[in-house]
Structure formats: C-alpha cells, structure tokens
Amino acid sequence: KDGKENGQGTHIWTNGNKYVGEFKDSKKHGQGTTTFHDDGTTYIGEFKDDEMHGQGTNTYANGDQYVGEFKDGKKHGQGTFTWTDGDKYVGEFKDDLKHGQGTYTMANGTVGKGIWENDELVEPN
C-alpha cells in the first residue's frame, strides 16, 4: 500500500540480518523473528515501530537468554535473564538494566534479593 510493506513478509538486509514477521508501513510491527547475521543473536516476539516492544525472547550468540517485556528496543518491565554460567535474575528491568524488585541467583546458590537500581542491588531484603 502506497509503496510500503504491510502484512506478513521477510526482509533480508545487505549485512545478512533477517526479519520474518509482520510489517506496518515498512516497519517491523507485530509478531516476528529477527536474526543478526554477525553473531547469531535472535529475537522472537513483538515489535512496534521497528523496535522490540512487548513480550519476547532474546537469545544471544553466547547462549545467554532474556525472556520478558521490552519497550522501545530495550529490556523493560518483568523478565528473566539467564546466563550460560547458571546465574539467573528474575524481576524488573528498566532501559536494559536490572531496576526494581528482583532476585539474582548465582550458579553457586548465592542469592541477592531486593530493590535494584541501575543494575545494582541497593536495598537487600
């Protein structure tokens, strides 16, 4: 419509990055999957205006994984980040950082629980 991509489709960029999913006005919008060619990172979930937005799963090339909410392309809201070394954080994120109520459990069993601000535990409980 008007020369813009709308509906289901696939777009492969010259750098090898690939998106399969819904488009609105030539932007990623709705459900889709993006694969980044340079390192194999994938995102499966919701998009809005070309950005990860809503519920999704981001699996990084090294195996780390985030499952949860995104806003404007960043981890934002409730989510779980699991590192390949066995560490796990379950809680709130803001602008890609641990921020709000959350629990960080290390692979060795050590637990940090409480209020987080800008990736730091500031009020343990």
What is each PLM-predicted segment?
Residues 123-125:
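Short, solvent-exposed mixed-charge patches
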